[in-house]
């Protein structure tokens, strides 16, 4: 009679057919039945079930981390991405604003340099007239107790007006100087409304002008006099 465990004959006859016994299933300690006569082990919690899968029991449930829809990074990556985009946009805006401020500052500095260069050239031309060998002067008392002096150089064909003690013009008005071309008034520039003492290089050549006058005009000046002169002076002839 064959063995009930390995299904092999009891004899050792060479004519017997040997068959390999089916190996018993391997069982882990938690799945292996207890030896006869031993106390039954206390039931274990479900999470402590077989970890090898030998008895068909599933592995303990592992909590899964949720991932964003795009599958990149841990949960909340979308929110982080939005904050990153906002921060990047703020940096770009700040850089653009800084660039605009830098351009404005550069323009202001350039304008200041141009004004300084223009004032320097104006002072140089004024000095050339005052120091010219043929420069002639004429002085006169002006309205309100002010004093005026005009300097003319025929070689430079230019004239300079020096004022001291000039009262300020009315609000919104300026003093405008005119060449007197045989009765026709030709604009020769504006005086500084904030300066009581001023030196003005008259705009344009003297040519045939015989004198000059000063009127009160709207801010920015006028193409021709709009008020009576507050001062009239003749140019020196000798």
Swiss-Prot record:
InterPro entries: Anti-sigma-K/W_factor, RskA_C. One of its GO terms (molecular function) is sigma factor antagonist activity. GO terms for cellular component: plasma membrane. It comes from the Bacteria. Residues 1-51, 214-238 are annotated as: Disordered. Residues 16-31 have a biased composition (Low complexity). Disulfide bonds: none annotated. GO terms for biological process: regulation of translation. This is Uncharacterized protein in phr 5'region. Pfam families: RskA_C. PANTHER family: ANTI-SIGMA-K FACTOR RSKA.
